């Protein structure tokens, strides 16, 4: 029995050794690991500069039209200038001007007569400051009493005006000469009425145009003028010297020296209307034959005043005016001179 028990114990031990060892008890199933995607690229080392965050992309450029350069404002127009009546303008201009004076007077017996003196001037600028000019004249006289009536084409004038503004001041110089071809020469067999018309024309024009009526003389004319023009106001003065040299006939003075001067004041009541007045003075600087004949002929003083309209026609100006003038001393007061001037300048 003992032997049988030993034999069975040995067999059991041998079977236990041949059987595989039992594994440990199974553990709870672990959660699945996250799936990763392997990138099969080689990553270069990252530098410090690359480690900075990338700059935001620049916004797309918007197409904007470049504005045109600013246009300069137009220059303000020059202040309005009151055009004088018989003084010379202190501007170089393109102008055609018809200027007529009707004078009424009496002779020593109190009989009335009249004179119409007409001037026509043309001027054209060759530079902004220089304007050559030509001036023509005609006079018609209805003499009082038994004196003969007459007409005369008087000496033309050829010359030039040089004018420049200096702030509100305008300066001008004038140089001209007469062409001694006028009618009424005392050395020719002309109608005596033309001689009388020339003498009457001098007084009708306040003695300011002596050179044109001195038909026997070649005259050199030189003058200067200055005007203050601002705020609708004009104040102008001028002075002129005339040197006359006889070139026709053998009688009379071989030479004479005359002078004229004047002052003009004007004001614009509205842009289309101005009022102007001027004082005019003429004096013989030499003892010319008229002075020797009667000392009161040495000088004349007149005063004129009147309105002038100003009409802009496109780029042109029409400035018609009318003035009344009266003599302030002899011989004009002796003959009771009253003068009306109609002035029609057209600037283009």
Report the location of each language-model feature.
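Surface-exposed strand-loop-strand hairpins of Gram-negative outer-membrane beta-barrel proteins
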Residues: 90-119, 138-149
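Residues that define the transmembrane beta-barrel architecture of outer-membrane proteins
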Residues: 112-118, 150-156, 169, 214-220, ...
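Outer-membrane beta-barrel channels and translocator barrels
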Residues: 125-131, 139, 165-169, 229-233, ...
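Outer membrane beta-barrel transmembrane domains
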Residues: 97, 101, 108, 245-348
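Structural signature of outer-membrane beta-barrel domains
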Residues: 103-107, 131, 135, 139-143, ...
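Outer-membrane beta-barrel biogenesis signature
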Residues: 17-99, 104, 109, 161, ...
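Transmembrane beta-strands of outer-membrane beta-barrel proteins
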Residues: 89-100, 128-134, 158, 171-175, ...
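Outer-membrane pore/translocation modules
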Residues: 147-256, 312
